[in-house]
């Protein structure tokens, strides 16, 4: 494992074991950010922030152990690396999982797997998030978990009815939905800034937004 505290870290890594790896990388590239796949210990070199994509949390946790990455993630985190977990990634980061043992346990919260129901209960909505965007933000929920409790050091970014869907502390960001499956780059931009990295000005992103939309399967998804 190579992750030195004094090394120059200006890259965002995406854990390349399962989930929307390509989609996360595309969003980061649209922001003009240096990014790469992380699949082995040497890949942590130069990584300022790591994204844990969605997928299936139990399978993802097992793959992390098989590839000997759990110690690498925890070591890099202790040395300053930021982490963002989406959907299953958020489950891995929680200190408490209803009915299960926790995995990495890096943010003080309790989470419920499949809190919104089965795959057939997946949906897309828009929500106001004035802290991050002047416009409504599209949210895609796919067999998503629900955050039921957060600790005193955790800030709620977005709450819908009686459950939390986005939260963060100084080092960790969690979203139970999939920002990488919409053209919106609001959450990727927020995470990049959290990692102390500058990105492409928003005015320069209009063309890339249109290009992403034209090839995205999400334009066919039902909206509620």
From Swiss-Prot:
Protein name: Pyridoxal 5'-phosphate synthase subunit PdxT
A single BP term in Gene Ontology: pyridoxal phosphate biosynthetic process
Reactions mediated catalytically: aldehydo-D-ribose 5-phosphate + D-glyceraldehyde 3-phosphate + L-glutamine = pyridoxal 5'-phosphate + L-glutamate + phosphate + 3 H2O + H(+); L-glutamine + H2O = L-glutamate + NH4(+)
Pfam families associated with the record: SNO
Source organism per UniProt: Syntrophus aciditrophicus (strain SB)
Gene behind this protein: pdxT
Residue sites binding L-glutamine per the record: 55-57, 113, 142-143
GO molecular function, one term: pyridoxal 5'-phosphate synthase (glutamine hydrolysing) activity
Family of this protein: Belongs to the glutaminase PdxT/SNO family.
EC number: 4.3.3.6, 3.5.1.2
Domain of life according to the entry: Bacteria
Gene Ontology, cellular component aspect: cytosol; glutaminase complex
């Amino acid at each position: 494992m190579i992750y030195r505290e004094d090394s120059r870290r200006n890259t965002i890594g995406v854990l390349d074991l399962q989930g929307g790896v390509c989609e996360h990388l595309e969003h980061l590239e649209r922001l003009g950010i240096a990014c790469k796949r992380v699949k082995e210990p040497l890949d942590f070199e130069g990584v300022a922030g790591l994204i844990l994509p969605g997928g299936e949390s139990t399978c993802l946790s097992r793959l992390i152990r098989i590839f000997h990455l759990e110690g690498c993630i925890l070591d890099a985190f202790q040395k300053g690396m930021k982490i963002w977990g989406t959907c299953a990634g958020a489950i891995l980061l929680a200190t408490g999982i209803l009915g299960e043992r926790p995995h990495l346990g890096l943010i003080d919260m309790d989470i419920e797997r499949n809190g919104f129901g089965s795959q057939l209960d997946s949906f897309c909505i828009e929500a106001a998030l004035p802290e991050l965007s002047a416009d409504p933000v599209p949210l895609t929920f796919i067999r998503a978990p629900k955050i039921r409790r957060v600790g005193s050091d955790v800030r709620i970014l977005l709450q819908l009815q009686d459950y939390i869907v986005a939260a963060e502390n100084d080092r960790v960001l969690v979203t139970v939905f999939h920002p990488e499956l919409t053209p919106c780059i609001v959450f990727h931009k927020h995470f990049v800034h959290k990692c102390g990295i500058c990105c492409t000005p928003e005015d320069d992103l209009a063309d890339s937004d249109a290009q992403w939309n034209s090839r995205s399967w999400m334009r066919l998804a039902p909206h509620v």
